[in-house]
């Protein structure tokens, strides 16, 4: 299925049905009074996040979504039927913008999350509501309200814990196929990857994380060159970025480290130009194609010194898997720690956080703390 991560649609909710002016007509009851019913509610349009969908392709070709109008009220105090609602199923991670103002309306980041894109109009009132002590036979009724109408731009940002960043042919697809269940197309020419790929990395039956691989960036990507800038938004939700750098060179006369430093600086600069917030995310350096370097340790030290890198660095070979296990476990431990921090912060905000007793010593096997001097015995 074709990957589509952006679509513009128009949603038109249904109009509410009109109320009606009607009077009770029954034998031997000459003055039956008003019995006009209310109009039915117009159909609303909802969006529901579905984890079984991974593309917005359905909305690329079906741009107009119009709900039906509610039925008009009837005599004998009969209300008009409400119109059926329309539910649009979208991928988890879809962000809905107002197409005219650019305002972010909804961010559907949980499975089964439901939001109202356009609310149906309320039904009008029948003349039964206007009866009073001074107006026993009212002829007033109200029309139904118009439903909401919007032009919306839907943008998909995939949900991943780790994002892969690098030039074309840096080995991103090879790495994700090595450490996860993803099977992207791999070839020895640039721009083999044409759309984001997601892979689940399992470190144990109960521990896993998701990796996102996007098309490679090239110099000038922030100004529209290449394909990578089209998909950088998919890295916005990640917790850490893996900056893959190819430290090998097909040219035996060229210095691969010097070229790798130039390439790495180009990626960092394009990231800063595109989105400073994305550039500020935690970033780990991954030196790839270790199997093609004579002295891997010397290459790593030289690169870090010339690149001015002091953060986490891993030297791997995506082809034979060397060094990938250390990378996987380091990522899992980091992500688990970040999730614990988020959970503690949420618990503190909710008032449910349990602070540790400073008198408790885990090394004593959970024994109760001694009674302080002067305490009750």
Swiss-Prot record:
Subunit text: Monomer.
Cofactor: Mg(2+)
Pfam families: GTP1_OBG, MMR_HSR1
Protein name: GTPase Obg
Protein task: An essential GTPase which binds GTP, GDP and possibly (p)ppGpp with moderate affinity, with high nucleotide exchange rates and a fairly low GTP hydrolysis rate. Plays a role in control of the cell cycle, stress response, ribosome biogenesis and in those bacteria that undergo differentiation, in morphogenesis control.
Root EC class: hydrolase
GO MF annotation terms: GTP binding; GTPase activity; magnesium ion binding
Domain OBG-type G: 160-336
Binding annotation for GTP: 166-173, 191-195, 213-216, 288-291, 317-319
Keywords associated with the record: Cytoplasm, GTP-binding, Hydrolase, Magnesium, Metal-binding, Nucleotide-binding
Compartments where found: Cytoplasm
Species lineage: Bacteria, Pseudomonadati, Pseudomonadota, Betaproteobacteria, Burkholderiales
Domain Obg: start-end pairs: 1-159
Region (Disordered): 127-148, 339-377
């Amino acid at each position: 299925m074709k990957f589509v991560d952006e679509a513009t649609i128009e949603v038109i909710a249904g109009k509410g049905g009109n109320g009606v002016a009607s009077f009770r007509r029954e034998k031997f009851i000459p003055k039956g009074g008003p019995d006009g019913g209310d109009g039915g509610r117009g159909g609303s349009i909802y969006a529901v996040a579905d984890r079984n969908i991974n593309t917005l392709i359905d909305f690329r070709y079906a741009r107009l979504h119009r709900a039906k109008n509610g039925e008009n009220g009837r005599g004998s105090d009969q209300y008009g039927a409400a119109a059926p609602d329309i539910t649009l199923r979208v991928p988890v991670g879809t962000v809905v913008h107002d197409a005219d103002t650019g305002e972010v309306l909804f961010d559907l980041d949980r499975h089964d999350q439901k939001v109202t894109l356009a609310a149906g109009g309320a039904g009008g009132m029948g003349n039964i509501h206007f009866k009073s002590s001074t107006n026993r036979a009212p002829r007033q009724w109200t029309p139904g309200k118009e439903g909401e109408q919007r032009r919306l731009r839907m943008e998909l940002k995939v949900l991943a814990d780790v994002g892969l960043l690098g030039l074309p042919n840096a080995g991103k697809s090879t790495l994700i196929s090595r450490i996860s269940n993803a099977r992207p197309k791999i070839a020895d020419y640039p721009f083999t990857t044409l759309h984001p790929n997601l892979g689940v990395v399992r470190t144990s039956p109960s521990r896993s994380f998701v990796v996102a691989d996007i098309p490679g960036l090239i110099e000038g990507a922030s100004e529209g060159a290449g394909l990578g800038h089209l998909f950088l938004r998919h890295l916005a939700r990640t917790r850490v970025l893996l900056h893959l750098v190819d430290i090998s060179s097909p040219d035996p006369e060229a210095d691969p480290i010097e070229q790798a430093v130039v390439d790495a600086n180009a990626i960092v600069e394009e990231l800063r130009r595109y989105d400073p917030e994305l550039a500020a995310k935690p970033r780990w350096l991954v030196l790839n194609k270790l199997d093609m370097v004579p002295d891997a340790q010397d290459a790593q030290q030289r690169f870090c010194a010339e690149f001015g890198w002091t953060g986490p660095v891993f030297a791997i070979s995506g082809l034979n898997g060397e060094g990938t296990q250390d990378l996987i476990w380091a990522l899992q431990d980091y992500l688990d720690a970040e999730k614990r921090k988020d959970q503690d912060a949420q618990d503190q905000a909710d008032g449910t956080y349990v602070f540790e007793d400073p008198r408790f010593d885990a090394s004593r096997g959970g024994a109760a703390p001694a009674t302080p001097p002067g305490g009750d015995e």
